[in-house]
C-alpha cells in the first residue's frame, strides 16, 4: 500500500 495522495503517478 503506497500513499497515492502524495504520488498519484506512482500508482
Curated annotation (Swiss-Prot):
A single Gene Ontology CC term: extracellular region
Keyword Secreted listed: yes
Location(s) in or outside the cell: Secreted
Residues bearing PTM Lysine amide: 11
Superkingdom: Eukaryota
Tissue spec: Expressed by the skin glands.
Keyword annotations of the record: Amidation, Secreted
Family: Belongs to the frog skin active peptide (FSAP) family. Hyposin subfamily.
Protein name: Hyposin-H2
Organism the protein comes from: Pithecopus azureus
Amino acid at each position: 500500500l503506497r500513499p497515492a495522495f502524495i504520488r498519484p503517478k506512482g500508482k
